[in-house]
A protein has these predicted regions:
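Membrane-interfacial segments
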Residues: 39-40, 73-76, 80, 116, ...
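Terminal transmembrane helical anchor/hairpin motif
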Residues: 46, 171-246, 251
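Helix-loop-helix units of permease transmembrane domains in multi-pass membrane transporters
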Residues: 70-104
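Secretory targeting signals
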Residues: 24, 29-64, 68-69, 100-161, ...
Length: 251
């Protein structure tokens, strides 16, 4: 699988995929650091909530749509999927290779941005942060995004880059309204685009006392969210792989 992932990464050379993976998170983090530097009395809680809300509700839905769309679009341009579908590698391995490439890109994006943000916070407001909590939240954001990546990979193959980007824009609205506001308090568990938003907030439980009434409730919600992510990833990834075994390209 490492060899397949390496091969998939080589295909992204001179494409927008690498720009999205490495350039976009740097710009995003630097903009936030500049904002922090220009304000007095900024707290770690404020930065934590603001950054991860924007990242999970806006950047991840749009980024997943763009990354999946571009990765599959490159295969479409390279002979209309013929080389892609007629590879000596099994269909399941090809599909998983694309999925793991998406995970690698999203993970790189998220951790690059978070590390730069933490470094910037340390310069702008020394000692004003819980950096382990930030990194844990970044990990939870990536984990919560796995079902979304599986959905976008399937959509990109089935309908193309336009559908993937369009779905990402719809996911942005769902993530912002259902994941980031009280409107979705009772239904967020049913909406995959709300999962990274909610999961990225749960590591803040570290800042609560274990005797706080909210502590136990937060932990229970976190476990429910993780169970939903595991189930969603299994369903969408397995469904996509079964469908891909018989797929012969778009007409």
């Amino acid at each position: 699988m490492i060899r397949i992932l390496s091969s998939e990464w080589l295909k992204t050379k001179r494409t927008a995929v690498r720009w999205i993976t490495f350039f976009m998170p740097v710009v995003t983090a630097l903009c936030i650091v500049a904002y922090i530097s220009g304000r007095a009395g900024v707290t770690a809680d404020f930065v934590y909530e603001g950054f991860f809300t924007v990242w999970t509700a806006v950047i991840i839905p749009l980024g997943a749509g763009l990354l999946a769309g571009f990765i599959i679009h490159e295969e479409e341009l390279a002979g209309g999927f013929h080389g892609f579908l007629n590879s000596e590698v099994s269909r399941d391995s090809v599909y998983l290779g694309k999925f793991f490439l998406l995970i690698f890109c999203l993970m790189s994006c998220t951790f690059i941005s978070t590390v730069i943000l933490c470094a910037g916070m340390n310069l702008a407001a020394p000692g004003n942060g819980y950096y382990a909590v930030f990194m844990t939240a970044a990990l939870f954001a990536v984990i919560g995004s796995l079902p979304i990546l599986a959905i976008h990979l399937w959509i990109s193959l089935l309908w193309g880059i336009g559908a993937s980007i369009g779905t990402g824009m719809g996911g942005l609205l769902m993530g912002a309204l259902i994941g980031a506001t009280s409107l979705g308090d009772k239904i967020w568990i049913l909406v995959p685009w709300a999962w990274p938003v909610k999961l990225s907030m749960f590591p803040a439980v570290y800042l609560l006392s274990r005797t706080d009434p909210a502590f136990g409730d937060t932990v229970r919600q976190m476990m429910t969210g993780l169970a939903a992510v595991v189930t969603g990833t299994a369903v969408f990834l397995t469904g996509g792989m079964i469908w891909f075994r018989k797929w012969e390209g778009r007409a």
